[in-house]
Amino acid sequence: MKATIIFFLVAQVSWAGPFQQKGLFDFMLEDEASGIGPEERFHEVPELEPMGPVCPFRCQCHLRVVQCSDLGLEKVPKDLPPDTALLDLQNNKITEIKDGDFKNLKNLHTLILINNKISKISPGAFAPLVKLERLYLSKNQLKELPEKMPKTLQELRVHENEITKVRKSVFNGLNQMIVVELGTNPLKSSGIENGAFQGMKKLSYIRIADTNITTIPQGLPPSLTELHLDGNKITKVDAASLKGLNNLAKLGLSFNSISAVDNGSLANTPHLRELHLNNNKLVKVPGGLADHKYIQVVYLHNNNISAIGSNDFCPPGYNTKKASYSGVSLFSNPVQYWEIQPSTFRCVYVRAAVQLGNYK
């Protein structure tokens, strides 16, 4: 029985004719022979549904994310999907942001324009972005901050540009702003208007590192918790420069030319937990550290400190409510470490938290 079935299948295969490639003309002849016209054949094909938003040429689109980075683009692509939430245009050759480049992008939350050649942004370019929260413009050629930024903005990063001025009017109405990054710009203290950041009531983080400023910017908002001013040309810290910063928890002033921290200056930052003053020109430990209730980390290495008093870091006695230090760095100072009293670091959490080392 099995042999009979196999024979039958082989016979069927042997009867099958060879495959013949058919062209459009062959199908037309078949239609003519069968009496079916072209219009009747294609009438049976159901109409296609309208296509959704088209992804720009060479870009990649997925789940409201449009990635157009590293494509050598010289301008913003047209016809971006209106539901885009994140638009990545970094590492291109875009030179200008024009009005209408972001039209209809009412759902955009994040715009990445890092590492282009942008030198001009039209005043109304960001107007359609009514939900924008994060704007990244670092590594471009901007000489000024963009005007009329969306009031929903929470994070602005514009480091490594050519910005020389920060006008107070630029930040007007940006009440949701939390982070501002302006480092590595040719900024001078005279280029930052007094109170330029004051109107941003929720501002928590400012970084203006590696610029030419010589003083701490005035009129900083009391909401600030982190202030990073490393790598500048600041020479002094006085009480007025830190006035009103009651919520400041981290202060970065390393790699400046600071020779003195005036008495009472640190009292204006009662919640300070971390202080970076390494790589400066200090000749003594800043006053007021012993009175700070919360400070836990102090970097003072690579200065000119030649003596350390027994009460420079800790209040008198041992039964205090001061937080214990978790890190104190004093290496690379011309201090005679064997002259330091054993009780000097009585409020340090563990002995290993103190870094002394040799002066070179």
Swiss-Prot record:
It is found in: Secreted, Extracellular space, Extracellular matrix; Secreted. Keywords: Disulfide bond, Extracellular matrix, Glycoprotein, Leucine-rich repeat, Proteoglycan, Repeat, Secreted, Signal. The keyword Transcription regulation does not apply. Disulfide bonds join C55-C61, C59-C68, C314-C347. LRR repeats lie at residues 74-94, 95-118, 119-142, 143-163, 164-187, 188-213, 214-234, 235-258, 259-282, 283-305, 306-335, 336-360. Residues 1-16 form the signal peptide. The attached glycosaminoglycan chain can be either chondroitin sulfate or dermatan sulfate depending upon the tissue of origin. Residues 17-30 form a propeptide. Glycans are attached at S34, N212, N263, N304. The keyword Kinase does not apply. One of its GO terms (cellular component) is extracellular space. Belongs to the small leucine-rich proteoglycan (SLRP) family. SLRP class I subfamily. May affect the rate of fibrils formation. Binds to type I and type II collagen, fibronectin and TGF-beta. Forms a ternary complex with MFAP2 and ELN. Interacts with DPT. This is Decorin. It comes from Ovis aries. The lineage of its organism: Eukaryota, Metazoa, Chordata, Craniata, Vertebrata. The gene is DCN.
